[in-house]
Design a protein with these regions (language model features):
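N-terminal alpha/beta PP-like core and its mobile active-site loop of ThDP/TPP-dependent enzymes
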Residues: 1-346, 398, 478-481, 518, ...
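Active-site diphosphate/adenylate-binding microenvironment
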Residues: 7-11, 15-20, 25-28, 33-38, ...
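Active-site phosphate/pyrophosphate- and oxyanion-stabilizing loops and adjacent acidic/basic residues
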Residues: 35, 59, 125, 232, ...
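Phosphate/pyrophosphate-binding active-site segments
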Residues: 138-141, 179, 202, 207, ...
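Conserved short loop/turn motifs at secondary-structure junctions
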Residues: 219-223, 377, 458-460
Length: 576
């Protein structure tokens, strides 16, 4: 029987699962991994500045690769530092394996330094509500069981992070047995309730009788299930307009004639008109929940008169919103494949309604798609955020990947950025932790080394996790960081200023030299004050061959293009 050290077993298993990178912060409780990493040459360790940053990097890696991300740090302070990042992954359904080191079993509850075992801090309990599984692995004997069980829980629907607290005994003990890959079991699994799906297809066909205005709202499930290509094929075949949620931006090309753009927060006028305009007969919701931002502050429930068909692998989402129409438990890919296979049965009705849909869509598109389009080419100073984002979109290759952080810049990017492919617009849209995109870009670049990566972030976000620019620079990753530096917590300031001078002051930030900060960390740094310099500076940064940061001196007094969303949320208080 084959035996190997616990650390070697873990690293070999990660390689067997297709991973090429491990994001980590070294520390005493994970020291045994250091010599093991020297033995496993197929796995590149990436050293983050902060344990939270390591998890954000793993999150970015997962989102960009379609695999899972792995992060490693010590228990106790390390696991507590990871908590927010793990929570962000859970709320967005990002598959992560988070591993923390723990003291030897015989030292638990004896005052050992950084003991976070179940008898003290109990970091598995800290992680439990943030993960799909949080478990202590006490010995190497049960490492094989818990490792594979954790990955099974991670890949099961809905996907999300898992946590293993690895005692010293588990790391240095001998693990018996060969590893059997887990991901392969899930690669072929496309669950679908056939009966519910067949009923949905009949309902779609019926809707094309007297009522033919059908649209799709595509959510993150389309991306998770690799269903974007099939969605495009079906939409084109029967002239079905497609809107996406902000989380799923890019799963349908936004320059496609059938694209409505984003619906919900930072959404387009076309998507709002199609879904809430009162003429829609049937809305096919693919892989999206009905959270606040993806439903225009839940107004889709009240304002849309359309019958809804909801396809999702998340049973909680289906049961919570079952009253909205017909629910189909299952993957978007499997449902769209069934739709393709049943084309002969549903084609007469869908084809009959296609001309009517084209007329309806043409009427919608006769109006402008975006709000305040004059802001895309303003030549005023300080620079308007929309102007900077438009210039960056022009500079970044079509298949480039944008990571967007949390703040006012998220609204500008969500509204004005054009995404053409799945996994090319990446943002933590549910929990929305500030600074997430800065380290996440490291993971994205590791997963997609041939793609150009740009981060749209803010000065408030830089205060949170800007130090991870040094990680990108350390590994000479050619990431371009664009800091929309408006000397404020943008969204919060826009609200606070209404209440007087002190609230506005409390939400303002000193005008830091972020370009100088980047240079101090080993990156190239540029400062732009004149919008006429944006194009040349972005090109220079993209050509730098290493990490670059552009400090864009931006205007904070710029209302965000979320007018439709605000109309639905007028009675509520917001913060981001």
């Amino acid at each position: 029987m084959t035996t190997k050290l616990g650390t070697d077993y873990i690293l070999d298993a990660l390689v067997a699962e297709g991973l090429a990178h491990l994001f980590m912060v070294p520390g005493g409780l994970v020291d045994p991994f250091l010599p093991a990493l020297a033995r496993q040459t197929k796995l590149q360790p990436v050293i983050a500045a902060h344990e939270g940053g390591a998890v954000y990097m793993a999150d970015g890696y997962a989102r960009a690769s379609g695999r899972f991300g792995a992060a490693l740090g010590i228990g106790g302070p390390g696991s507590c530092n990871m908590a927010t990042a793990v929570a962000a992954a859970k709320t967005d359904g990002s598959p992560l394996l988070v591993m923390t080191g723990e003291v030897p079993v015989d030292l638990e509850d004896r005052g050992a330094f950084q003991d976070a075992s179940q008898a003290t801090l109990n970091d598995t309990a800290v992680m439990a509500p943030l993960t799909h599984l949080s478990q202590t692995v006490a010995t190497a004997n049960n490492l094989n069981h818990w490792f594979r069980h954790a990955l099974t829980a991670m890949w099961s629907q809905p996907r999300g992070p898992v946590h293993l607290s690895l005692t010293h005994d588990a790391l240095v003990g001998e693990c018996v047995g060969a590893y059997v890959q887990v991901a392969g079991f899930f690669a072929q699994a496309q669950p679908l309730s056939t009966e519910a799906a067949e009923t949905a297809l009949r309902l779609l066909a019926d809707a094309n009788g007297a009522k033919s205005r059908i649209a799709v709202l595509a959510g993150a499930g389309v991306e998770h299930d690799a269903a974007a290509a099939r969605l495009k094929e079906i939409a084109e075949r029967w002239s079905i307009p497609v809107a996406t949620t902000l989380r799923a931006k890019g799963v349908f090309p936004e320059d496609h004639p059938l694209s409505l753009g984003v619906f919900g927060y930072a959404g387009t006028r076309h998507a709002t008109a199609a879904i809430l305009g009162g003429e829609l007969d049937c809305l096919l919701v693919l892989g999206s929940g009905f959270n606040e931002r993806d439903t225009m502050h839940w107004t889709v429930r009240e304002r849309s008169k359309a019958f809804m068909i909801h396809v999702n692998t998340d049973m909680e989402e289906l049961t919570a919103n079952g009253e909205l129409g017909h629910v189909v438990p299952g993957s978007c890919h499997a449902f769209l494949d069934l739709m393709h296979k049943r084309a002969a049965d549903i084609a007469p009705a869908l084809t009959a309604g296609a001309a009517h849909r084209r007329e309806w869509l043409a009427a919608i598109k006769a109006a402008p798609r975006l709000y305040d389009i004059e802001n895309l080419s303003r030549r005023t100073t300080p620079i308007h955020p929309a102007t900077a984002i438009a210039a960056l979109r022009q500079a970044l290759p079509r298949d480039g990947i944008a990571l967007v952080d949390s703040g006012a810049h998220r609204a500008f990017a969500g509204h004005y950025w054009t995404a053409y492919e799945p996994r090319t617009y990446i943002s933590a849209t549910n929990l929305g932790p500030m600074g997430w995109a800065i380290p996440a870009a490291v993971g994205v670049q590791c997963a997609q080394p041939e793609r150009r990566i740009a981060v749209i972030t803010g000065d408030g976000c830089m205060q949170m996790h800007g130090i991870e620019v040094q990680t990108a620079a350390r590994y000479r990753l050619p990431i371009v960081y664009v800091v929309i530096n408006n000397s404020a917590l943008g969204n919060v300031w826009l609200r606070a200023r209404q209440y007087g001078a002190l609230p506005a002051e409390l939400t303002s930030i000193p005008d830091h030299d972020w370009a100088g900060f980047a240079r101090a960390l080993g990156a190239q740094g540029f400062t732009v004050r004149d919008p006429a310099q944006l194009d040349a500076t972005f090109q220079q940064a993209l050509a730098a061959g290493t990490t670059a940061l552009i400090d864009v001196k931006a205007d904070k007094n710029c209302p965000t293009p979320v007018y439709d969303f605000n109309a639905g949320a007028r009675a509520w208080s917001y913060h981001e």
